């Protein structure tokens, strides 16, 4: 899209609400400079329309009705089209705090008909062709990134256009294939046309399918980098699960007592393990109980175990294995599991020869071998074949994954039709459907309702 669309001018606070060193109030639209000029007084009284683009300018924000200075500011001027929204943009950098930023915003809104909705700045960047839908979604992922690996390898690469380029190139290749097949069909007087058309369709379909399936194979690692490695800690009550959580978090979050059943719900926290977000789920101890509240916690623990990418089973190594320990070993045997033998600071009584592989002796009381847990997790999920590749494009967005799966299904339908000897012109329908599905990923073929729903998830001011 080369021509910027005409929208109302909008404004919003772009920094988090609350106390802070600075606050930013952003204005975007054709009237941005005119609106800012009504409340901004530069040091030399220079008109904003005469100020060079992409500069910071010292001055004051003044209430024009009272002629009172509200704040000392640095005002950024960025003129279209070289801005995020491809519109004229003013950014007022104020002292932090909700009072002053909100007061300045109210002065601005008094001269406007339209306040910014959540995500509207990014939506305008999309509608004006500055970013595609994958890049717009990457902006939201950057805001929510929990670790630097997610930031660099998933969100930043997507914002830079890695997925957009791959999808657009594939769509163009599909279009070229459809055009070539169409030409061959339109000139049937040549004896070898049908064979050439079928051969071309088969080769290209297999090529596109392999590319999409390779992309799908990145989804598991991409999901882990984006959402975190869901990790459930299980064990009978009072074996040290809550203290283990505190040790990994390096702060007190869970209640640690000698009373069984202290953790009555599922506690979720994130911890950075070598750049990978680990979503630690601290479950209630799984045991038979008559306590209604604790029973609900136990059921939630079992559900967390079923949904976990990784299970940390904590056993008390200072006692022999109990029936409940053996039950938990059986319950988690199909999971990616690490067995932690806690209380190595006490005399050992557990039957080590009855335990499975992947066992780490620890002492949560003395914080012993906690680092080995982190190393083992990294070995299981990210060493060798699982290592994060710097140049790879990762699928991490559920919407993208679902659409790629649909595209693969359409390509499979083409291949199956070719095997059955169906006419190529009938199979063009499925190939065209693949082209349309991929367009939904970038936004070239996305319905308006989807676009509205996606941008509504953004924070106000972005």
From Swiss-Prot:
Residues 228-382 form the TrmE-type G domain. It comes from the Bacteria. CDD domains: trmE, TrmE_N. Its main location: cytoplasm. GO terms for biological process: tRNA methylation; tRNA wobble uridine modification. Transmembrane segments: none annotated. It is found in: Cytoplasm. SUPFAM superfamilies: P-loop containing nucleoside triphosphate hydrolases (SSF52540), TrmE connector domain (SSF116878). Its EC number is 3.6.-.-. PROSITE patterns: G_TRME. Mg(2+) binds at residues 242, 263. Keywords: Cytoplasm, GTP-binding, Hydrolase, Magnesium, Metal-binding, Nucleotide-binding, Potassium, tRNA processing. K(+) binds at residues 238, 257, 259, 262. Binds 1 potassium ion per subunit. GO terms for molecular function: GTP binding; GTPase activity; metal ion binding. Its cofactor is K(+). Pfam families: MMR_HSR1, MnmE_helical, TrmE_N. Exhibits a very high intrinsic GTPase hydrolysis rate. Involved in the addition of a carboxymethylaminomethyl (cmnm) group at the wobble position (U34) of certain tRNAs, forming tRNA-cmnm(5)s(2)U34. Homodimer. Heterotetramer of two MnmE and two MnmG subunits. This is tRNA modification GTPase MnmE. It comes from Streptococcus agalactiae.
């Amino acid at each position: 899209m080369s021509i910027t669309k005409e929208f109302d001018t909008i404004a919003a606070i772009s920094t988090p609400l609350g106390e802070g060193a600075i606050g930013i109030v952003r204005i975007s639209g054709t009237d941005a400079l005119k609106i800012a000029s009504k409340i901004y007084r530069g040091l030399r009284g220079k008109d904003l329309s005469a100020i060079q683009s992409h500069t910071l300018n010292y001055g004051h924000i003044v209430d024009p009705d009272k002629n009172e200075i509200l704040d000392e500011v640095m005002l950024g001027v960025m003129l279209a089209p070289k801005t995020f929204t491809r519109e004229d943009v003013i950014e007022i950098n104020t002292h932090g705090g909700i009072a002053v930023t909100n007061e300045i915003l109210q002065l601005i809104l008094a001269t406007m008909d339209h306040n910014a909705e959540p995500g509207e700045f990014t939506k305008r960047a999309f509608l004006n062709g500055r970013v595609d839908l994958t890049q717009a979604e990457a902006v939201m992922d950057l805001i929510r990134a929990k670790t630097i690996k997610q930031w660099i390898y998933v969100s930043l690469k997507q914002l830079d256009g890695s997925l957009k380029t791959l999808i657009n190139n594939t769509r163009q290749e599909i279009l070229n294939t459809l055009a070539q097949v169409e030409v061959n069909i339109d000139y049937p007087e040549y004896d070898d046309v049908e064979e050439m058309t079928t051969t071309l369709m088969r080769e290209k379909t297999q090529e596109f399918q392999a590319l999409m399936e390779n992309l799908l194979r990145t989804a598991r690692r991409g999901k882990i980098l984006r959402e975190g490695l869901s990790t459930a800690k299980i064990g009978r009550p009072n074996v040290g699960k809550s203290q283990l959580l505190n040790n990994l978090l390096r702060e007190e979050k869970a209640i640690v007592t000698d009373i069984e059943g202290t953790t009555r719900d599922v506690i979720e926290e994130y911890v950075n393990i070598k750049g990978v977000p680990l979503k630690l789920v601290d479950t209630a101890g799984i045991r038979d109980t008559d306590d209604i509240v604790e029973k609900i916690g136990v059921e939630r623990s079992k559900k967390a175990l079923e949904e976990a990418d990784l299970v940390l089973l904590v056993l008390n190594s200072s006692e022999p294995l109990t029936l409940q320990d053996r039950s938990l070993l059986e319950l988690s045997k199909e999971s990616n599991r690490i067995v932690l033998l806690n209380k190595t600071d006490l005399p050992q009584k557990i039957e080590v020869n009855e335990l499975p592989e992947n066992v780490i002796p620890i002492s949560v009381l003395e914080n012993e071998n906690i680092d080995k847990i982190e190393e083992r997790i990294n070995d299981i999920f990210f060493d060798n074949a699982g290592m994060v590749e710097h140049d790879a494009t990762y699928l991490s967005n559920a919407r993208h994954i679902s659409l790629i799966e649909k595209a693969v299904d359409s390509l499979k339908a083409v291949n199956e039709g070719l095997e059955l000897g169906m006419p190529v012109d009938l199979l063009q329908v499925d190939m065209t459907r693949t082209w349309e599905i991929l367009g939904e990923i970038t936004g070239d073929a996305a319905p308006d309702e989807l676009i509205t729903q996606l941008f509504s998830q953004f924070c106000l001011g972005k």
